[in-house]
Structure formats: structure tokens, C-alpha cells
Amino acid sequence: MPTTKLKVTGINHVVLHVTDVERSKRFYMEVLGFEDRNLSVGSSMKASFLRCGVQGLDLFEVANGDVHGGKEMNHMALCVAADDLDEIVTELSKVGVESSDRTPRNTVFISDPDGHRIEMLPFSASERALEREAARASR
């Protein structure tokens, strides 16, 4: 396969179809700490645009409730500022969010209110510092 000079530097946004925009918005903001981008779309559709760092999460309410129809997104992976997986699991359980058993890669999965799978990866302070240094060096 031919190569290009393009360099992908991160994910801009992920779009999820949901059954209730407000419920999903509360989940992502209150449980996972996303922020509201305060954007709007035409009045014919219900949507919410959130942010996690510089990445966006766009939630669109589907009229027929079929959030997994057609082309389903397999999952979204989130790096979580935590030193280990136990810290993530403990915090999630405090708010009633159940997680899967640990995977061989030391991650867990949770589901949002519409059943979208979310992989949670611990990302320690030292790992975050290394990533920031690598990003600065690549500029």
C-alpha cells in the first residue's frame, strides 16, 4: 500500500447515535467528566456536542431508537488519568457503573446508557508527561 506524508495526530471527534440525548449527555458529563461545547444544530434534530480534552463526542438522538442499526461503532477507548485500573473500577462503582472483567491488556469495558462499549485505560501521570514531551518534540 502506498504511503503518504500525512500524519494523523489524534482523534477529532466520535459520533454516537443515542435514544435520549439528555440522558447520554448527563452520563458523559457527570460520570466521565466530559464538557459541553455549547454548539447547536438545526431545530429538526436533537444533538449534543461534548469535549474531552481536545477531542469531541457528538451525540445524535435517533428517532426510531435503533442506535445500533446499520454500521455500529465497536467501541471507544478513553485514556483515564489514573495510576491503575483499581482506581478506575472503584470510582465507577461509586456511581453505580459496572465494569467488565479486566482484559489481558489491563483495561475494562463499561457501557453507556445506550449500550455503546467504552474501553477504559489507566494513563498515569508519568505516561501523560511522556506523551506531552513526545507531542512537543514532534512539532
PLM-predicted stretches and their roles:
Residues M1-E22, N74-M76, V80, E127-R139:
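N-terminal beta-strand motif that seeds the catalytic metal site of vicinal oxygen chelate
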Residues K5, Y28, V67, F109-D112:
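A general structural signal for stabilizing positions within well-ordered secondary structure
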Residues T9, M45, K71, T103-R105:
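Loop/turn position at the start of each blade in beta-propeller repeats
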Residues V18-E22, M76-R117, F123-R128:
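Vicinal oxygen chelate
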Residues E22-D36, I88-E91:
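Amphipathic alpha-helical segments
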Residues G33-S40, K94-S100:
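Short secondary-structure junctions
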Residues E35-G70, R117-S124:
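Conserved short beta-strand elements that form part of the metal-binding/catalytic scaffold
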Residues N64-H68, I88, A125-R136:
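Short, basic, helix/turn surface patches
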